Protein backbone atom coordinates (compact mmCIF):
# COMPACT_ATOMS: atom_id res chain seq x y z
CA UNK A 1 0.00 0.00 0.00
CA UNK A 2 1.36 3.41 -0.99
CA UNK A 3 0.82 5.92 1.80
CA UNK A 4 0.84 9.66 1.15
CA UNK A 5 2.07 11.50 4.21
CA UNK A 6 0.96 15.04 4.95
CA UNK A 7 3.80 17.43 5.68
CA UNK A 8 4.20 18.95 9.13
CA UNK A 9 3.82 22.39 7.57
CA UNK A 10 0.44 21.57 6.06
CA UNK A 11 -0.83 19.74 9.14
CA UNK A 12 0.25 22.46 11.55
CA UNK A 13 -1.15 25.11 9.22
CA UNK A 14 -4.59 23.52 9.46
CA UNK A 15 -4.39 23.81 13.24
CA UNK A 16 -3.25 27.43 13.04
CA UNK A 17 -6.47 28.20 11.17
CA UNK A 18 -8.45 27.22 14.29
CA UNK A 19 -6.45 29.56 16.53
CA UNK A 20 -8.57 31.81 18.73
CA UNK A 21 -11.64 29.65 18.25
CA UNK A 22 -13.81 27.13 20.07
CA UNK A 23 -14.08 23.43 19.21
CA UNK A 24 -17.21 21.74 20.57
CA UNK A 25 -18.02 18.11 21.35
CA UNK A 26 -21.20 16.92 19.60
CA UNK A 27 -22.99 13.57 19.49
CA UNK A 28 -25.39 14.10 16.57
CA UNK A 29 -26.16 16.31 13.58
CA UNK A 30 -28.50 18.60 15.53
CA UNK A 31 -25.80 19.45 18.07
CA UNK A 32 -23.28 19.93 15.28
CA UNK A 33 -25.54 22.47 13.60
CA UNK A 34 -26.01 24.31 16.91
CA UNK A 35 -22.23 24.46 17.33
CA UNK A 36 -21.69 25.74 13.80
CA UNK A 37 -24.41 28.39 14.17
CA UNK A 38 -22.83 29.54 17.44
CA UNK A 39 -19.51 30.16 15.71
CA UNK A 40 -17.49 27.03 16.55
CA UNK A 41 -14.41 26.66 14.34
CA UNK A 42 -14.73 22.85 14.41
CA UNK A 43 -16.68 20.06 16.08
CA UNK A 44 -15.59 16.82 17.73
CA UNK A 45 -17.89 13.92 16.85
CA UNK A 46 -18.42 11.36 19.63
CA UNK A 47 -20.99 8.83 20.80
CA UNK A 48 -21.04 10.31 24.32
CA UNK A 49 -19.62 13.49 25.81
CA UNK A 50 -16.93 13.01 28.48
CA UNK A 51 -19.29 13.42 31.46
CA UNK A 52 -21.46 10.58 30.12
CA UNK A 53 -18.39 8.45 29.42
CA UNK A 54 -17.26 9.05 33.00
CA UNK A 55 -20.70 8.18 34.40
CA UNK A 56 -21.12 5.04 32.30
CA UNK A 57 -17.72 3.55 33.09
CA UNK A 58 -16.62 0.44 31.21
CA UNK A 59 -14.58 0.65 28.01
CA UNK A 60 -14.96 3.80 25.88
CA UNK A 61 -14.10 3.31 22.20
CA UNK A 62 -14.10 5.23 18.93
CA UNK A 63 -17.55 6.53 17.99
CA UNK A 64 -19.71 4.52 15.61
CA UNK A 65 -18.74 5.60 12.07
CA UNK A 66 -22.42 6.28 11.39
CA UNK A 67 -22.39 9.08 13.97
CA UNK A 68 -19.19 10.56 12.58
CA UNK A 69 -20.60 10.51 9.02
CA UNK A 70 -23.85 12.09 10.22
CA UNK A 71 -21.92 14.98 11.76
CA UNK A 72 -19.67 15.34 8.70
CA UNK A 73 -22.71 15.60 6.44
CA UNK A 74 -24.43 18.15 8.69
CA UNK A 75 -21.84 20.94 8.83
CA UNK A 76 -19.31 22.76 6.66
CA UNK A 77 -16.75 23.37 9.43
CA UNK A 78 -13.96 20.83 10.14
CA UNK A 79 -14.94 17.62 11.93
CA UNK A 80 -12.65 15.89 14.41
CA UNK A 81 -13.07 12.46 15.98
CA UNK A 82 -11.40 10.57 18.81
CA UNK A 83 -9.34 7.38 18.63
CA UNK A 84 -8.03 5.42 21.59
CA UNK A 85 -4.41 5.95 22.59
CA UNK A 86 -2.29 3.55 20.56
CA UNK A 87 -5.19 2.13 18.52
CA UNK A 88 -3.73 2.14 15.01
CA UNK A 89 -6.81 0.68 13.34
CA UNK A 90 -9.31 3.12 14.86
CA UNK A 91 -7.12 5.96 13.62
CA UNK A 92 -6.80 4.43 10.15
CA UNK A 93 -10.57 3.98 9.95
CA UNK A 94 -11.16 7.63 10.85
CA UNK A 95 -8.53 8.70 8.33
CA UNK A 96 -10.23 6.60 5.63
CA UNK A 97 -13.56 8.25 6.47
CA UNK A 98 -12.06 11.66 5.76
CA UNK A 99 -12.23 13.35 9.15
CA UNK A 100 -10.27 16.59 9.29
CA UNK A 101 -8.44 15.82 12.54
CA UNK A 102 -8.01 12.85 14.88
CA UNK A 103 -7.76 13.29 18.64
CA UNK A 104 -5.65 10.51 20.20
CA UNK A 105 -7.61 10.90 23.37
CA UNK A 106 -7.29 9.93 27.02
CA UNK A 107 -11.08 10.38 27.28
CA UNK A 108 -11.37 6.97 25.62
CA UNK A 109 -10.01 3.82 27.23
CA UNK A 110 -6.39 3.39 26.06
CA UNK A 111 -5.76 0.48 23.69
CA UNK A 112 -2.01 0.49 24.38
CA UNK A 113 -0.52 1.39 27.75
CA UNK A 114 3.02 1.55 26.39
CA UNK A 115 2.95 3.15 22.93
CA UNK A 116 1.18 6.17 21.50
CA UNK A 117 0.40 6.33 17.79
CA UNK A 118 3.24 7.28 15.45
CA UNK A 119 1.25 10.14 14.06
CA UNK A 120 3.84 11.18 11.46
CA UNK A 121 2.90 8.06 9.47
CA UNK A 122 -0.63 9.38 8.85
CA UNK A 123 -1.84 11.90 6.29
CA UNK A 124 -4.53 13.25 8.62
CA UNK A 125 -3.31 15.63 11.35
CA UNK A 126 -3.60 14.75 15.04
CA UNK A 127 -4.34 16.60 18.27
CA UNK A 128 -3.10 15.20 21.59
CA UNK A 129 -3.37 16.14 25.26
CA UNK A 130 -0.54 17.20 27.55
CA UNK A 131 -0.02 18.10 31.20
CA UNK A 132 3.52 19.44 30.94
CA UNK A 133 6.21 20.31 28.42
CA UNK A 134 7.66 16.79 28.38
CA UNK A 135 4.33 15.28 27.34
CA UNK A 136 3.82 18.06 24.80
CA UNK A 137 7.17 17.50 23.12
CA UNK A 138 6.85 13.72 23.09
CA UNK A 139 3.55 14.02 21.26
CA UNK A 140 4.99 16.54 18.79
CA UNK A 141 7.94 14.21 18.29
CA UNK A 142 5.48 11.47 17.31
CA UNK A 143 3.85 13.82 14.82
CA UNK A 144 1.07 15.69 16.65
CA UNK A 145 0.14 18.90 14.85
CA UNK A 146 -1.94 20.40 17.65
CA UNK A 147 -1.97 20.12 21.42
CA UNK A 148 -4.51 20.69 24.17
CA UNK A 149 -4.33 20.58 27.92
CA UNK A 150 -5.64 17.33 29.34
CA UNK A 151 -7.45 18.99 32.25
CA UNK A 152 -9.88 16.55 33.82
CA UNK A 153 -12.55 15.82 31.18
CA UNK A 154 -16.21 15.57 32.07
CA UNK A 155 -15.89 17.27 35.44
CA UNK A 156 -16.86 20.85 34.64
CA UNK A 157 -13.92 21.79 36.88
CA UNK A 158 -11.29 24.05 35.31
CA UNK A 159 -8.58 23.63 37.97
CA UNK A 160 -6.60 20.88 36.21
CA UNK A 161 -6.62 22.65 32.84
CA UNK A 162 -5.32 25.77 34.61
CA UNK A 163 -2.59 23.71 36.26
CA UNK A 164 -1.54 22.20 32.93
CA UNK A 165 -1.43 25.42 30.87
CA UNK A 166 0.50 27.20 33.62
CA UNK A 167 3.01 24.36 33.90
CA UNK A 168 3.64 24.13 30.15
CA UNK A 169 4.11 27.88 29.85
CA UNK A 170 6.41 28.06 32.89
CA UNK A 171 8.57 25.28 31.47
CA UNK A 172 8.73 27.06 28.11
CA UNK A 173 9.97 30.23 29.83
CA UNK A 174 12.62 28.15 31.59
CA UNK A 175 13.83 26.66 28.30
CA UNK A 176 13.94 30.05 26.57
CA UNK A 177 16.12 31.40 29.39
CA UNK A 178 18.60 28.52 29.18
CA UNK A 179 21.99 28.58 27.49
CA UNK A 180 22.31 26.24 24.52
CA UNK A 181 24.72 24.00 26.41
CA UNK A 182 22.02 23.37 29.04
CA UNK A 183 19.38 22.17 26.59
CA UNK A 184 20.59 18.59 26.19
CA UNK A 185 20.35 18.02 29.94
CA UNK A 186 16.88 19.56 29.94
CA UNK A 187 15.90 17.26 27.07
CA UNK A 188 17.01 14.34 29.22
CA UNK A 189 15.07 15.66 32.23
CA UNK A 190 11.91 16.10 30.16
CA UNK A 191 12.37 12.86 28.18
CA UNK A 192 11.82 15.00 25.11
CA UNK A 193 13.53 15.40 21.71
CA UNK A 194 16.52 17.76 21.84
CA UNK A 195 15.67 19.24 18.42
CA UNK A 196 12.29 20.40 19.69
CA UNK A 197 13.88 22.18 22.64
CA UNK A 198 16.07 24.01 20.13
CA UNK A 199 12.91 25.09 18.30
CA UNK A 200 11.31 26.36 21.50
CA UNK A 201 14.50 28.25 22.36
CA UNK A 202 14.42 29.92 18.92
CA UNK A 203 10.66 30.55 18.72
CA UNK A 204 9.97 31.38 22.36
CA UNK A 205 6.91 29.12 22.22
CA UNK A 206 5.70 25.68 21.17
CA UNK A 207 5.99 24.94 17.43
CA UNK A 208 2.29 23.97 17.37
CA UNK A 209 -0.86 25.52 18.83
CA UNK A 210 -1.94 24.52 22.34
CA UNK A 211 -5.66 24.73 23.11
CA UNK A 212 -7.36 24.52 26.51
CA UNK A 213 -9.47 21.46 27.27
CA UNK A 214 -10.79 19.47 30.19
CA UNK A 215 -13.23 21.22 32.52
CA UNK A 216 -14.33 24.32 30.58
CA UNK A 217 -17.93 24.87 31.72
CA UNK A 218 -18.66 28.62 31.56
CA UNK A 219 -17.79 31.65 29.42
CA UNK A 220 -15.54 32.84 32.25
CA UNK A 221 -13.68 29.50 32.19
CA UNK A 222 -13.02 29.88 28.47
CA UNK A 223 -11.86 33.47 28.93
CA UNK A 224 -9.58 32.45 31.80
CA UNK A 225 -7.79 29.87 29.67
CA UNK A 226 -7.26 32.42 26.90
CA UNK A 227 -5.96 34.88 29.51
CA UNK A 228 -3.43 32.25 30.60
CA UNK A 229 -2.11 31.84 27.07
CA UNK A 230 -4.20 29.11 25.43
CA UNK A 231 -4.52 29.38 21.65
CA UNK A 232 -8.18 28.35 21.70
CA UNK A 233 -10.67 26.25 23.63
CA UNK A 234 -12.18 22.77 23.45
CA UNK A 235 -15.53 22.42 25.22
CA UNK A 236 -16.69 18.88 25.89
CA UNK A 237 -19.61 18.40 28.24
CA UNK A 238 -19.95 22.06 29.22
CA UNK A 239 -22.30 23.12 26.42
CA UNK A 240 -24.77 20.30 25.89
CA UNK A 241 -24.97 19.44 29.59
CA UNK A 242 -25.98 23.02 30.41
CA UNK A 243 -29.56 24.28 30.79
CA UNK A 244 -29.56 26.27 27.52
CA UNK A 245 -27.00 24.78 25.09
CA UNK A 246 -27.57 27.30 22.28
CA UNK A 247 -27.03 30.26 24.59
CA UNK A 248 -24.02 28.63 26.25
CA UNK A 249 -22.42 27.83 22.90
CA UNK A 250 -22.72 31.40 21.62
CA UNK A 251 -21.58 32.87 24.94
CA UNK A 252 -18.46 30.69 25.12
CA UNK A 253 -17.49 31.61 21.56
CA UNK A 254 -17.90 35.31 22.34
CA UNK A 255 -16.00 35.02 25.63
CA UNK A 256 -13.13 33.21 23.90
CA UNK A 257 -12.85 35.92 21.25
CA UNK A 258 -13.25 38.85 23.65
CA UNK A 259 -11.60 37.28 26.68
CA UNK A 260 -10.46 40.58 28.18
CA UNK A 261 -13.81 42.33 27.76
CA UNK A 262 -15.07 41.64 31.27
CA UNK A 263 -18.25 43.70 30.91
CA UNK A 264 -19.21 41.62 27.89
CA UNK A 265 -18.49 38.37 29.72
CA UNK A 266 -20.71 39.54 32.59
CA UNK A 267 -23.55 40.32 30.18
CA UNK A 268 -23.11 37.00 28.37
CA UNK A 269 -23.34 35.13 31.66
CA UNK A 270 -26.55 36.76 32.94
CA UNK A 271 -29.21 34.75 31.10
CA UNK A 272 -27.52 31.39 30.60
CA UNK A 273 -29.31 29.35 33.24
CA UNK A 274 -27.54 26.53 35.04
CA UNK A 275 -24.16 25.30 33.80
CA UNK A 276 -23.33 21.59 33.89
CA UNK A 277 -23.03 20.04 37.32
CA UNK A 278 -19.37 19.90 38.33
CA UNK A 279 -17.20 17.38 40.16
CA UNK A 280 -14.61 18.21 42.81
CA UNK A 281 -11.32 16.72 41.60
CA UNK A 282 -10.27 15.51 45.06
CA UNK A 283 -13.29 13.17 45.09
CA UNK A 284 -12.01 11.24 42.08
CA UNK A 285 -10.22 7.96 42.67
CA UNK A 286 -6.87 7.52 40.94
CA UNK A 287 -8.35 5.18 38.32
CA UNK A 288 -11.06 7.76 37.55
CA UNK A 289 -8.55 10.46 36.59
CA UNK A 290 -8.51 10.44 32.80
CA UNK A 291 -5.53 12.78 32.68
CA UNK A 292 -3.32 9.98 34.02
CA UNK A 293 -3.79 7.98 30.82
CA UNK A 294 -0.88 8.13 28.38
CA UNK A 295 2.62 9.33 29.28
Curated annotation (Swiss-Prot):
It comes from Pasteurella multocida (strain Pm70). It is an enzyme of class 4 (lyase). D-glyceraldehyde 3-phosphate binds at residue 166. Pathway: Cofactor biosynthesis; pyridoxal 5'-phosphate biosynthesis. Its EC number is 4.3.3.6. The active site is at residue 82. Keywords: Lyase, Pyridoxal phosphate, Schiff base. SUPFAM superfamilies: Ribulose-phoshate binding barrel. This is Pyridoxal 5'-phosphate synthase subunit PdxS.
Amino acid sequence: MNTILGSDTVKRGMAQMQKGGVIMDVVNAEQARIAEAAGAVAVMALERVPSDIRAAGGVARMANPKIVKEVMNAVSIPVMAKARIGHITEARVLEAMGVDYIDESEVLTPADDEFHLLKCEFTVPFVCGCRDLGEALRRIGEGASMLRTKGEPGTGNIVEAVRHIRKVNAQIRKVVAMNHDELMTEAKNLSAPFELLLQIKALGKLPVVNFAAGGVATPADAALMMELGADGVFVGSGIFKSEHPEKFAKAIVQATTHYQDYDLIARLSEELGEPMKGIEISRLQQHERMQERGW
